[in-house]
């Protein structure tokens, strides 16, 4: 099977056809990037060294969500439940959720990774592979590992700091996941301004919404709720949403690591 698939991939590369695949190999259960799965990447490099039609460029792509359609499934898996097998009933349940509000999907492109540049860095640019079943030399294995790490780093740099991620970051750090509304709005403004003025990377994108607008947005998505109080309204995470919001918090944690050390 591997030989057939490698040959198929080689034929696609020979025709200069764009290819999409996911470097993590599967969906993250935590919201953080997974260690790279290098199988497809290794086959791509192998095919390139068999016959260089055109230079290969990997375009790291960040995809961020504001709400997960399979949120209940995610929470169950985080609590140790086995992954459910796909079924017709499951598809019908998913279709019924389409009418709900799921916010936006954010797509952002990271710095391109040029394969030929990494081959040169590892002194592997002169290597040629003659056959489909020829093993990958050690230098090329290093190229594959290096390419995978750079792709993941560039995905992280292209992070989109969206309203839901900021809400999650702030409310999950509070006792009982609640905060005075005025203080919450100010905290959101501070974090947004920090991410804007001290960006994680030039490709990082930050929401333009103010703290009050972010709160209104979270209420619209039914991820948080407003609790009336005589001393001032309280913003709290909706029931059973705390575990789910850890996913969105973890999406952006790396962007605040260095500022948190100051």
Label every model-predicted segment.
Residues 1-262:
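Membrane-interfacial terminal anchoring regions of lipid-handling membrane enzymes
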């Amino acid at each position: 099977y591997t030989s057939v698939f490698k040959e198929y991939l080689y034929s696609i590369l020979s025709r200069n056809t764009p290819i999409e695949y996911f470097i993590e190999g599967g969906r993250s259960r935590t919201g953080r990037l997974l260690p790279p799965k290098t199988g497809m990447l290794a086959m791509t490099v192998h095919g390139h060294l068999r016959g260089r039609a055109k230079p290969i460029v990997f375009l790291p792509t960040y995809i961020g969500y504001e709400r997960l359609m399979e949120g209940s499934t995610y929470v169950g898996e985080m609590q140790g439940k086995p992954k459910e097998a796909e079924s017709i009933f499951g598809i019908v349940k998913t279709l019924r959720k389409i009418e709900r509000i799921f916010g936006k999907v954010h797509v952002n492109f990271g710095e391109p990774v040029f394969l030929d540049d990494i081959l040169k860095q590892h002194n592997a640019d002169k290597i040629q592979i003659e056959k489909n079943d020829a093993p990958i030399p050690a230098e090329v294995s290093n190229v594959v590992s290096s390419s995978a790490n750079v792709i993941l780093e560039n995905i992280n740099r292209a992070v989109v700091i969206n309203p839901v991620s900021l809400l999650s970051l702030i409310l999950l750090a509070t006792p009982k996941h609640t905060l005075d509304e005025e203080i919450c709005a100010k905290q959101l403004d501070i974090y947004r301004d920090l991410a804007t003025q001290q960006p994680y990377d030039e490709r990082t994108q930050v929401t333009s919404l103010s703290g009050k607008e972010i709160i209104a947005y979270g209420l619209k998505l039914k991820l948080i709720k407003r609790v009336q109080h005589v001393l001032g309204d309280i913003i709290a995470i909706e029931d059973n949403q705390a575990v789910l919001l850890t996913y969105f918090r973890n999406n952006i944690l790396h962007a605040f690591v260095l500022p948190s050390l100051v």
